[in-house]
From Swiss-Prot:
UniProt xrefs under Gene3D superfamilies: Cytochrome P450 (1.10.630.10)
GO molecular function, one term: heme binding
The name this protein goes by in its record: Steroid 17-alpha-hydroxylase/17,20 lyase
Catalysed reaction equations from the record: a C21-steroid + reduced [NADPH--hemoprotein reductase] + O2 = a 17alpha-hydroxy-C21-steroid + oxidized [NADPH--hemoprotein reductase] + H2O + H(+); progesterone + reduced [NADPH--hemoprotein reductase] + O2 = 17alpha-hydroxyprogesterone + oxidized [NADPH--hemoprotein reductase] + H2O + H(+); pregnenolone + reduced [NADPH--hemoprotein reductase] + O2 = 17alpha-hydroxypregnenolone + oxidized [NADPH--hemoprotein reductase] + H2O + H(+); 17alpha-hydroxyprogesterone + reduced [NADPH--hemoprotein reductase] + O2 = androst-4-ene-3,17-dione + acetate + oxidized [NADPH--hemoprotein reductase] + H2O + 2 H(+)
PROSITE patterns cross-referenced by the UniProt entry: CYTOCHROME_P450
Keyword 4Fe-4S applies: no
Family affiliation: Belongs to the cytochrome P450 family.
GO biological processes: glucocorticoid biosynthetic process; hormone biosynthetic process; progesterone metabolic process; steroid metabolic process
Protein's job: A cytochrome P450 monooxygenase involved in corticoid and androgen biosynthesis. Catalyzes 17-alpha hydroxylation of C21 steroids, which is common for both pathways. A second oxidative step, required only for androgen synthesis, involves an acyl-carbon cleavage. The 17-alpha hydroxy intermediates, as part of adrenal glucocorticoids biosynthesis pathway, are precursors of cortisol.
List of residues binding substrate: 202
Amino acid sequence: MWVLLGVFLLTLAYLFWPKTKHSAAKYPRSLPSLPLVGSLLFLPRRGQQHENFFKLQEKYGPIYSFRLGSKTTVMIGHHQLAREVLLKKGKEFSGRPKVATLDILSDNQKGIAFADHGAHWQLHRKLVLNAFALFKDGNLKLEKIINQEANVLCDFLATQHGQSIDLSEPLSLAVTNIISFICFNFSFKNEDPALKAIQNVNDGILEVLSKEILLDIFPALKIFPSKAMEKMKGCVETRNELLNEILEKCQENFTSDSITNLLHILMQAKVNADNNNAGPDQDSKLLSNRHMLATIADIFGAGVETTTSVIKWIVAYLLHHPSLKKRIQDSIDQNIGFNRTPTISDRNCLVLLEATIREVLRIRPVAPMLIPHKAIIDSSIGDLTIDKGTDVVVNLWALHHNEKEWQQPDLFMPERFLDPTGTQLISPSLSYLPFGAGPRSCVGEMLARQELFLFMSRLLQRFNLEIPDDGKLPSLEGNPSLVLQIKPFKVKIEVRQAWKEAQAEGSTS
């Protein structure tokens, strides 16, 4: 027994004792580190993680490292270094680390969001981008799909005139239906129990990811029961059952003559691979139902909560800045009026609205810290050595709140994104990467930007979004998780009088 214990302790020491680095190499400055636990005891325990890592830059600089268990992580907090990691050396840092909770979420690194660099990730990312290309023109045009759901949302909100409501559920339904149409050409009804189940699953997953889970740091702890891991497994099982039911129905009716959604793209790729009618990168084994399910789950997971959260952040900031809201509505009235639906081309005339959206994405980035990257080869950042297998995290919060790049970064100032005349959009700083960049950038960036503009222009065209009668303004402190969520709040819905008059006039003419 004592021999076994000794072997066990020696094994732990080998795994977790800091390794000797190449003597000639120059590495990022590191937080203090202890055997077994690494830097865990030296990391701030209170407050929001992204803000804590930003504050550590005051002592350690814009690039520093720390150890958690046996893993070394490098934190990046400056746009030049971030762009080197994401763009200049994007392929070298295109890996993803194995993390216990995310392995469950991604079915052991399937899909695209959490998949490691390799043939599977490259194939599925390419197929997802091909699917988005389906929605550029015609009846499947993305703008048309978004406007359909925006109209349904607005029609529902019109029934809530004079009421103070939480926008979460109606917004989530609208955005879920857009994602569902892209994946399956399928939409949910408001009373559909599957819709509520999907929302509950997403909430459960984000709740788990918002917690610090020791198993993610010390994989050896998997031998012990974990309530968080069990909850994650339950959420993923429910999610997979719901999506698999839809997937199987779509497979029954699939024909290669009509490719109209993401699932069709994935199924056609599998047919081609099975028939040896595909390139060497399309291995049929990488296109199993489990692989397809993981990719579709990624699109749902990334596409719904992110957009819903950003729209709620925009509404919250407008409630805090009513004069800005009025100016945006004035520009909508002057440039669009009430007799047509806003279009993407209206960005050119609704520059204040677009600047407001961009400022919200800056001051409250939906992912304050990008999903960790991993060095797939020995590399460098600046003049510092980065060993193969090192995790690299870009602190987007630090980039977006750098005082040297942004004047008074904690103030909400949409004018940052406008020229001095207020008539042209500008890019005021390279320290702005709301959707990431490079090989691992957000595949749904175009979709998200269109959703944000079309939903907000439609809402402000039809409604006055007001502070509830109790005078309670939304908190601007977020709930950190994989997504920076706003705390629940209510907004009073009032149909605009000018909209009512325009509709009445149109019905009598």
